């Protein structure tokens, strides 16, 4: 099978490209996986490659050669470009918000070793930086399975997977070097210990709110106000898009029971932890106030986004929510002072 053809083999213990050796058995090369002698096939009508002398089926030769090539590059360059790190807070039906921890960055390496057993797993490549280590998994034919993923999480070691499943089977060293050192599109975090730490911190700082029908009562940012003046939010319309919703509480059957919300503490980004609670509330309230004033300017109720209608009452002109059976919001403007007077406070 062409996907198992080798373009790199071991010669005198060194990974060697097919272009660097003589044809046939004179190449004096062995398979990097099984150790069997190889034949260098360099005819005029074929793409040059190594083949096993006995035509045996070795399904790991190509993959192992890529592991070795990646190791050689990382040892030479002593660095790797890592993808950005972000927390994904899954909210509903796959939708989620992202909180960025760090952008793409280079990790300077002290050492790189290949396929060395670590507890219950054998990572493809282990990169060391000081007293920390990074597992690098190279996906050629099989992605990391759940069993290996769970063991990586248990070991609390940051791990990236590099997807080479769609790259040219005759990838050159320069092409792989570009992927390792200049690109992140083919890299993804299988697990990141820093992300996990921050995720736990957000969840621990969140309050639990029970769902009643589709409603979450006592919304800490007063997304909506009912006709009795009680704050609430609608799960499907508000919570899943809210910057403070960090998790959805579900039962074993997957039914939604409530949410985890950081609204009371006004925490939505990593940078919020560097501010005091009073600073966070002030910033959040200013943003909410501006949003609600903008809704009023559009003729919409700031609490349910229903159209406001103009009415005339005992004390003159006022504007009322047209969703009157559920929302009693009204406002008027003092003719003398221009002051905005609302039945419910905007904050």
Language model regions located:
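Non-catalytic C-terminal interaction segments of nucleic acid-processing enzymes
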Residues: 14, 158-160, 164-347
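Catalytic cores of nucleic-acid endonucleases
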Residues: 109-194, 307
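Short strand-connecting beta-turns/loops that link adjacent beta-strands
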Residues: 45, 130-131, 314
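Short beta-strand-initiation
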Residues: 26, 120-122, 296
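Short glycine-aromatic motifs
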Residues: 38, 104-112, 242, 308
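N-terminal cysteine/histidine-rich coordination modules
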Residues: 1-77
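Active-site metal-binding core of divalent-cation-utilizing nuclease and nuclease-like domains
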Residues: 19-21, 81-137
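A generic structural motif
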Residues: 30, 126-128, 300, 322
């Amino acid at each position: 099978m062409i996907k198992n053809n080798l373009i790199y083999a071991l010669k005198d213990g060194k990974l060697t490209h097919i272009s660097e050796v003589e044809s046939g058995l004179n190449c004096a090369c062995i398979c990097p996986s099984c150790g069997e002698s190889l034949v260098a096939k360099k005819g005029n009508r074929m793409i040059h490659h190594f083949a096993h002398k006995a035509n045996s089926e070795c399904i790991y030769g190509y993959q192992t050669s890529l592991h070795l090539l990646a190791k050689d590059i990382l040892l030479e360059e002593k660095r790797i470009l890592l993808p950005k790190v972000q927390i994904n807070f899954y909210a509903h039906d796959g939708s989620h918000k992202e909180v960025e921890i760090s952008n793409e960055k280079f990790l300077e390496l002290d050492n790189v070793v290949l396929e060395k057993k670590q507890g219950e797993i054998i990572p493809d490549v282990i990169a060391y930086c000081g007293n920390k280590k990074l597992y690098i998994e190279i996906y050629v034919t099989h992605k990391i399975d759940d069993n290996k993923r769970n063991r990586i999480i248990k070991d609390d070691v940051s791990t990236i997977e590099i997807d080479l499943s769609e790259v040219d089977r005759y990838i050159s060293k320069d092409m792989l070097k570009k992927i390792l050192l200049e690109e992140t599109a083919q890299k993804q975090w299988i697990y990141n210990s820093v992300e996990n730490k921050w995720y736990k911190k957000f969840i621990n700082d969140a309050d639990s709110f029970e769902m009643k029908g589709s409603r979450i009562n006592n919304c800490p940012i007063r997304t909506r106000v009912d006709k009795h003046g009680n704050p609430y939010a609608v799960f499907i319309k508000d919570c899943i898009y809210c910057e403070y919703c960090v998790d959805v509480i579900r039962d074993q059957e997957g039914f939604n029971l409530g949410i985890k919300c950081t609204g009371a503490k006004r925490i939505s980004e990593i940078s919020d932890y560097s501010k005091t609670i009073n600073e966070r509330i002030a910033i959040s309230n200013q943003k909410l106030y501006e949003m609600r004033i903008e809704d009023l300017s559009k003729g919409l109720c700031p609490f349910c986004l229903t159209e406001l209608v103009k009415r005339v009452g005992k004390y003159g002109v006022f504007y009322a929510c047209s969703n009157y059976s559920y929302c009693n919001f009204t406002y008027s403007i003092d003719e003398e002072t221009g002051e905005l007077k609302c039945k419910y406070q905007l904050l």
